[in-house]
Amino acid sequence: MAQAKKGAPKKGQKTRRREKKNVPHGAAHIKSTFNNTIVSITDPQGNVIAWASSGHVGFKGSRKSTPFAAQLAAENAARKAQEHGVKKVDVFVKGPGSGRETAIRSLQAAGLEVGAIADVTPQPHNGCRPPKRRRV
């Protein structure tokens, strides 16, 4: 069975090319869980311009939760965002993971100017029952 060629679209098919936006100021949302770190850079309206995660960068399993994986994910997202003209970001950090501070530092090192830093971790007012304690 022959496989369809990837690349050029078929005749009459619409293509969706990613247009380069010019957004000088944005927001960096860092979601750091115990298993992964996701960095999304958005415009002021909240539309995602660039994103990267520890898994997307190439880490698997328990290595996704390391600060080094978060650093590479943040650098990757910052590089993509700078192609769209982002120069300054406000940082919103969510979650208890180990890659929080490392991701913020690597956004600065990648050349983005960091404005405000806010912790937006959701706090339950005694909502769902937490998972059972681990016994190792």
From Swiss-Prot:
Residues 1-31 are annotated as: Disordered. GO terms for biological process: translation. Pfam families: Ribosomal_S11. Transmembrane segments: none annotated. Residues 7-20 have a biased composition (Basic residues). GO terms for molecular function: rRNA binding; structural constituent of ribosome. The keyword Ribonucleoprotein applies. Keywords: Ribonucleoprotein, Ribosomal protein, RNA-binding, rRNA-binding. InterPro entries: Ribosomal_uS11, Ribosomal_uS11_bac-type, Ribosomal_uS11_CS, Ribosomal_uS11_sf. The keyword Ribonucleoprotein applies. GO terms for cellular component: ribonucleoprotein complex; ribosome. NCBIfam families: PRK05309.1, uS11_bact. Belongs to the universal ribosomal protein uS11 family. Part of the 30S ribosomal subunit. Interacts with proteins S7 and S18. Binds to IF-3. Located on the platform of the 30S subunit, it bridges several disparate RNA helices of the 16S rRNA. Forms part of the Shine-Dalgarno cleft in the 70S ribosome. This is Small ribosomal subunit protein uS11. It comes from Mycolicibacterium gilvum (strain PYR-GCK).
